[in-house]
């Protein structure tokens, strides 16, 4: 690395574990961190207010970290990583342990700063989080990268497709298809077939069993399903 100081200025890191000074007000923490990156106190305070307001913790600015909830500590660490306007933000499990409402709020914030030009590297075990936020995705299995592609390519790579089928009569024969069929109730089922199987073929097979199809809906494959498929290859 030829220019470590310049590189450091370009990167913000949010670790999974809390590493905060528990005994000083969080606004003071932000000013101190800003100083490390060459910001004046005035500049650091201005940026802190902007970040704290965006993250919903401005009203806690005079509190110490030990007085904050887990979700507030998480947001403080995100603000701390952004105090110097980095070009790259590395997030390690940023929404671990937070409730659903806060997770959605944080996702919106990540989308906002990404749209503003910040590149984000996100590590997460929440596959829905990856699907919602990521444009490119790598799946690592036992230390090996088994997939590294744009999200749209990954989501279309599944060899299976799932449909919800509604019929006008009772489904009694699960052997209509060789593929996986899960009976939801008397007149509907969830059917997983090869991607090459057309809707016409599905309807024809039901008709051959004297069952009329009223409706057939595509159920989008979830990233969880694709993850299992990729890691079991």
Language model features: what each stretch is:
Residues 107-193:
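ABC transporter nucleotide-binding domain
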Residues 159-233:
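Short, charged/small-residue-rich alpha-helical element at the C-terminal edge
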Residues 64-68:
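Conserved ABC ATPase signature
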Residues 89-92:
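Catalytic Walker B motif of ABC-type/P-loop ATPase nucleotide-binding domains
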Residues 31, 35, 42-60:
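Conserved ABC ATPase "signature" region
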Residues 78:
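Hydrophobic anchor residue at the start of the ABC signature
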């Amino acid at each position: 690395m030829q220019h470590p100081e310049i590189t450091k200025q370009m990167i913000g890191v949010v670790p999974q574990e809390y590493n905060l000074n528990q005994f000083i007000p969080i606004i003071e923490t932000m000013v101190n961190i800003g100083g490390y990156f060459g910001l004046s106190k005035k500049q650091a305070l201005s940026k802190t207010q902007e970040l704290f307001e965006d993250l919903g913790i401005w009203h806690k600015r005079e509190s110490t970290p030990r007085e904050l909830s887990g979700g507030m500590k998480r947001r403080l660490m995100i603000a701390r990583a952004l105090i110097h306007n980095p070009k790259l933000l590395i997030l390690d499990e940023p929404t671990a342990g937070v409730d659903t409402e806060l997770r959605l709020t944080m996702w919106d914030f990540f989308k906002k700063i990404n749209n503003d030009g910040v590149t984000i590297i996100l590590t997460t075990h929440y596959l829905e989080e990856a699907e919602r936020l990521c444009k490119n995705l790598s799946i690592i299995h036992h230390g090996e990268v088994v997939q590294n592609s744009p999200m749209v390519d990954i989501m279309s790579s599944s060899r299976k497709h799932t449909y919800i089928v509604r019929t006008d009569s009772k489904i009694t024969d699960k052997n209509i298809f060789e593929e996986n069929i899960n009976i939801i109730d008397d007149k509907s089922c969830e059917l997983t077939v090869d991607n090459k199987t057309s809707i016409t073929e599905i309807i024809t097979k039901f008709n051959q069993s004297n069952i009329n199809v009223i409706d057939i809906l595509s159920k989008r494959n979830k990233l969880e399903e694709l993850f299992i498929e990729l890691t079991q290859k």
